[in-house]
Amino acid sequence: MRRLIGFCVVLWIGIALQAQSLYPDFSKMNFGCDGNSITAGEQWSKTVVDLLGFATHHNVAVGSATWACHSDTQDYGSAGFAGISGGWRPTEDSHELQMRHNNVSKVHIQKFIAEVENGQYPVPDVFVFSMGTNDKNLGSAEESLKGKTLAEVDVTTMAGGARWAIQTILEHYPKCRVFVCTPIQTGDVTRNERNLEKIAILREICRA
């Protein structure tokens, strides 16, 4: 994971500053991203792609997503895989609950890689993660970085899920420039204090 990972708050500015010096022609670059509701669909990432003129836009973000997995999260494409849901309203539907438990970065990244490998999308030149707002079980950067392999990482914590997702993208696409965007400020003081904890964890993981 010892590769350059940028933190950007103003997303398109961050990407432009890092990428322009190496890739002045964005029309030859492919853009990928993962995140939660503020990234899902054609929101800021679509604006980035359009303004800078990226060749492709591969977005696997889903609303309500977290870095952390659940104890019953399924691998993407595994036997009996239920799918992914961004639902958040109360429900007792077991299939819907399983799909919600699959709405995590690990599964999103498995989906992203599968779609590249089957030819739906090209290998990314730039990849942006923008999530963490919905995470509750933070864990610690120190614990998440102890394992030598990703199989040893506890992905049921935000820290572990983040390490798994970021490192997996870097290992699969070593030439890709990866950016990690931290949770945005809110009008809630308590929530902002919690976000500062998340930011510190993500920063430490990215510097490892």
Show which residues each predicted segment covers.
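N-terminal cationic-hydrophobic initiation segments that often serve targeting/anchoring roles
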Residues: 49, 169-171
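A general structural detector for well-ordered alpha-helical segments in enzyme core domains, enriched
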Residues: 112, 158-165, 198-202
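Conserved SGNH/GDSL esterase-like catalytic core that processes O-acyl groups on lipids
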Residues: 25-33, 38-152, 156
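Bacterial N-terminal signal peptides
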Residues: 6-16
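Positively charged n-region of N-terminal signal peptides that target proteins for export
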Residues: 1-4
